Amino acid sequence: MSNTYFYSDEEIYNLLRPYVAKWFRQKYTTFTPPQRAAIPLIKQNYNVLVSSPTGSGKTLAAFLGILDSLFELGDNNELEDKVYAIYISPLRALNNDMQRNLLEPLNELRQVNSKLPDVRVGIRTSDTTPYEKQKMLKKPPHILITTPESFGISITSPKFSQKLTDVKWIIVDEIHELANSKRGAYLSAMLELFRNLITKKEFVRIGLSATVSPLEEVAQFLVGKDREYRIVDARFVKPVDIKVISPVKDLVHSSESEVDKGIYKTILNEVKKHRTTLIFTNTRHATERVAYKLRKLAENEKVFDVDAIEAHHSSLSRDVRLDVEEKLKKGILKVVVSSTSLELGIDIGYIDLVILLSSPKSVSRLLQRIGRAGHHIRSISKGRVIVVDRDDLVECSVLAKLARDRKIDSIHIPKNPLDVLSQIIVSASLISPIDRDDLFKILRRSYNFSDLSESDYSLVLRYLSGDFFGVELKNVYAKIRIKEEKIIYPKKGSRLIFYTNSGTIPDEAMISVVTENNRYVGNLEEEFVEILSPGDIFVLSGRTYEFIGSKGSKVIVKEAMGQRPTVPSWFSEMLPLAYESALEIGKFRREIAEMIKKGVTHNEIIESISKEYEIDKHASMSIYTYILEQYLFTNGKVPSDNLILIEIYDDEEGIRNYIFHALYGRRALDALSRAFAYVVSEELDTDVRVSVTDNGFALSVKRDVPFDYNIKSLFEKITPDNVYDIVTRAVMRTEMLKRRFRHCAERSFMILRRYKGRETNLERRELNSEILLKAIREIGNFPVMKETIREILEDHMDILRAKEILKKIASQEIKVDVFGPTNIPSPFSHSIILKGHSDVVLAEDRRELLKKLHERVVEFLRQKGVNIELEYTSV
């Protein structure tokens, strides 16, 4: 923020037309920090990234200068029938908000100036009717509101694109949400096509973002290569009040009913003190459960109207979600429970408290969620984080401190997605025939494709030309023609294929589950199926099943009565802990362990935690005793940011578990766990079950492992140089590869979601995908397969960070130690071991299992001469 210059009110008023300045003075009295910095920059035609919290006025910061410039044109009779500004957002709901938010000031300005020029605002999305689109051709809006996908289609439209040739400003809202996905790559490349093939001149790019980091990279994503930009850093202009709350004094010995009672008592106490409360959970299932329990409580205790409690998540119909949003705006609701669907800046009116149930897994998400409270620049964003266990308590305490200290984790921006590249090449050919070398230069100005290799580009051109297929199939799969090996033309039919199949969001599929004798069991979401491996146990309709495999859109299982689930049904929905946040949690563990080692007293350590992390003494004691138990149990080996501890635990079912305690973010751990499992499986010629959490991962094998098997030697066999290849081999036969291949094939127009205007059958697409996948395995360097592997390793996992960790291990910056074998798991391993239990047993029983594991730890320490219960009471 120190590099951001904030202009005075008078300086900005002097830049505006008198009647615009008068209207603003009457309505707002003063400019907000993002407005003070951004409006003058936009008036000076700078590319600008504005990063500030919800309710800080960044939307008006973007539009006020633009409206003023359009009024100037109108006052001079120079306002023509063409589009001057385009607003692009990831959500259609945001687009509807934006239209309302622009029409309101236009109507108010008309009261200040009766001769106000008629500035038109219009929406063009997939919901826009052909009639409305036709009207736009005759009388286009001066400000066009759209989505990335509709923008891509608009610039390839021969007629409508002619109305866009003089666009002066493009605003990208919620840019942080777009930048970390393939939708962002699509938009980034489309903006380059727009600049070079439609406007043929530069336009002002304005990015609006919530709290995000690093700002420099997001700004480069916005403007592309070799363009100047300015950053308005107003991320921390709103005061934030964050508190982490433990629902009970003792998270270990309290029963599940006591913890549950404590959670809802805390929620009710907070809700009573506030007008409107927004509660975030981490899964849709939890959202429904919390909303249901709150309704029951409200009914029993008569504290507020049952109808004033609603749930809001992506599985609900659009009409239901819109109804909830409308009730929120009108102030009818007391409580709304959501998963991730209300994180973005949809206008939901007045919220004065946000409650987070459990960790949001990253600092940026914590700030974004809490930022929904106090929807005004001078309001305090008030957030309460309620934890559910000791791991959650440690994690949330560290995340809250990082948020207060303004340390935000980095965004991940996908690089060189070849399926998106396929769409961009087809769209470029539809705008006009283009020289392949010229298009390559244009594409490399996009941040996402700035280091696109000539070989990958040629590979995708060959694929789109049908060169990978025999003569009989060439015409079926080709989407372009390249004349004289130079000029790219669209193939007949490509325009309709592009219009009906472009975009990057895959269709969500429900997969039928059947037994080996074809008895129907139920349905699973595709994102859950993709994390399954043969032998995995999961729960469906209250019964346990073993996953055998899949065929097309069917999952084949067999009953697994009495077996412990290895994958909880909600796990695919769980957000992964961010890398930087994980490192900070590891650092915190290390610092407490060092204090214990130095002999710092219990009370001093607890006092230090309370003061530095702003939590109460009971929560501090829970954290301290948790780390103390691990320290005493493992003889001082507390896994941290610079220590990976491999714990060898032999369980009661005859399974040897190699538990890797490692805090480096779940995406990196996902990659490492698959590499290690693959090598162990190859070396021991046995099946290896993998379980990954945010705090580490476990490799489980049958007990007949050679007694002297050196698990630590894996770090010599898996290196920064070979880990990419090993993980690639590991994922080649997974469900994830099958599912992601279909998504990439659909994005690459190899499998069509819509053909000749009609929706194609999903089951047929699944089968086609399987057939193609088998055939393509034989083709070397096939771009769709190459992209599938890249997406899994770089976007879903974090292979780059996995390499970084292995480098640090090789240089001894990160140490690796081994503990065990033992038949009692260490305190830190309990959550990893019990990962699947939440589906097969009641939560009450799961907590009882945790208590029993804890009792075994206490007994183990007692045998070592340490009475941990006395340690507690001495505090």
Curated annotation (Swiss-Prot):
Motif (DEIH box): 173-176
InterPro entries in the record: ATP-dep_Helicase, DEAD/DEAH_assoc, DEAD/DEAH_box_helicase_dom, Helicase_ATP-bd, Helicase_C-like, Lhr-like_ATP-dep_RNA_helic_prd, Lhr_WH_dom, P-loop_NTPase
Region (Domain 4): 507-875
EC numbers: 5.6.2.4
Catalysed reaction, written as an equation: Couples ATP hydrolysis with the unwinding of duplex DNA by translocating in the 3'-5' direction; ATP + H2O = ADP + phosphate + H(+)
Alphabetically ordered keywords of this record: ATP-binding, DNA damage, DNA repair, DNA-binding, Helicase, Hydrolase, Isomerase, Nucleotide-binding
Catalytic class of the enzyme: isomerase
Residue ranges of domain Helicase ATP-binding in the record: 39-230
Segments of this protein annotated with the region WH domain: 420-506
Positions of the record's site feature: Wedges between bases of the loading strand: 505
Residues reported in the UniProt entry to bind ATP: 35, 58-59, 173-174, 355, 372, 375
Domains: entry comment: Composed of 2 helicase domains, a winged-helix (WH) domain, and Lhr-specific domain 4.
Subunit structure: Monomer and homodimer. The monomeric form has helicase, ATPase and strand annealing activities, while the dimeric form only has ATPAse and strand annealing activities. Interacts with DNA topoisomerase 3 (topA).
Job description of the protein: DNA helicase that translocates in a 3'-5' direction on single-stranded (ss)DNA, probably involved in DNA repair. Unwinds DNA in a 3'-5' direction, unwinding is ATP-dependent, acts preferentially on fork and 3'-tailed DNA; bubble and blunt-ended double-stranded (ds)DNA are not substrates. Has winding and unwinding activity, unwinds Holliday junction (HJ) DNA in the presence of ATP, the main product is forked DNA, single-stranded binding protein (SSB) does not stimulate activity.
UniProt record similarity statement: Belongs to the Lhr helicase family. Lhr-Core subfamily.
Name the record gives this protein: ATP-dependent helicase Lhr-Core
Taxon lineage: Archaea, Thermoproteota, Thermoprotei, Sulfolobales, Sulfolobaceae
